[in-house]
Amino acid sequence: MNTMKTTYIVLELIIAVLSIAGNVLVCWAVAINSTLKNATNYFLVSLAVADIAVGLLAIPFAITISIGFQVDFHSCLFFACFVLVLTQSSIFSLLAVAIDRYLAIKIPLRYNSLVTGKRARGLIAVLWLLSFVIGLTPLMGWNKAMSGCPNSTNETGADHGAGHHGCFISCLFENVVTMSYMVYFNFFGCVLLPLIIMLGIYIKIFMVACKQLHQIELMGNSRTTLQKEVHAAKSLAIIVGLFAFCWLPLHILNCITHFHEEFSKSKPEWVMYVAIILSHANSVINPIIYAYRIRDFRYTFHKIISKILCKTDDFPKCTTDNNQHLTVTNVNAPAASVTI
């Protein structure tokens, strides 16, 4: 094993540990702090669960694949597809949060009755199901079985056809997943399109908020709460932006590989390693953003860590002074409030 691959594996293991620790902290915070139990944060928990799975399962799979060991074709294909499931779940969670924030600021009077915790949990279940369908699509036939298996042999040295489970190959991502799936279906249809939709939603959120701030004569308190809503939208938009920053390089490399086959043969090995590490590092970022930008999470993280380090018996309840509420207020109407 060369130095570059060893460095890659060490960095992946560090990312895995940080991802698991940080996102378990997010789930723990929502579980113990009642002010964090709302539809928006349920979507963030879904995102955290996907990031935990990245650290717990996807990164070990990625390390295994990078080694290129000999394994049954469909087992290798499952390893390769699993990270696609988690990526798709993250995309859907971010899209759900964007739509949730748009509804909160666009129809504040109906928001609380329309967006409930029960509906959010049901939607999360549906989105995870869709993520599995999309991510595991290569297992249904859109893969490199025909080109990957005919010349491969099993442990006894006997040749096997593409459709047989005894087909053993060197388990590398590009040996099992077609670039046509990765580029046209996964990237263009299931990653880039939702990112463009989210960009449009957040632009619309800021336009609506600015219009309300400038055209409606709000009372001091109402103006403050609307500004808090805008601050929250900015925090979530940052998360989307960082997701795009971390994942687009890998997808761009896939596009170049697909449209320029000679690049796939000549590209430096380190380029792909950097792109993969960057994509996995995204799973570490979100808890940091929550702690830095969202007061409720910061407060609860502090209490959890204090409890662990100081061995305190009870978890102190949050006071309203330490909570950041996302509230959209309409003139002459009660506020629709949700805390994240």
Curated annotation (Swiss-Prot):
One of its GO terms (cellular component) is plasma membrane. It is a multi-pass membrane protein. Disulfide bonds join 76-171. Residues 32-41, 100-119, 204-235, 292-340 are cytoplasmic. A lipid is attached at residue 310 (S-palmitoyl cysteine). Adenosine binds at residues 174, 254, 279-280. The chain crosses the membrane at residues 7-31, 42-65, 77-99, 120-142, 179-203, 236-259, 268-291. One of its GO terms (biological process) is cGMP-mediated signaling. InterPro entries: Adeno_A2B_rcpt, Adenosn_rcpt, GPCR_Rhodpsn, GPCR_Rhodpsn_7TM. One of its GO terms (molecular function) is G protein-coupled adenosine receptor activity. Residues 1-6, 66-76, 143-178, 260-267 are extracellular. The keyword Transport does not apply. Keywords: Cell membrane, Disulfide bond, G-protein coupled receptor, Glycoprotein, Lipoprotein, Membrane, Palmitate, Receptor, Transducer, Transmembrane, Transmembrane helix. Receptor for adenosine. The activity of this receptor is mediated by G proteins which activate adenylyl cyclase. PANTHER family: ADENOSINE RECEPTOR A2B (PTHR24246:SF18), OLFACTORY RECEPTOR AND ADENOSINE RECEPTOR (PTHR24246). Belongs to the G-protein coupled receptor 1 family. This is Adenosine receptor A2b. It comes from Gallus gallus (Chicken).
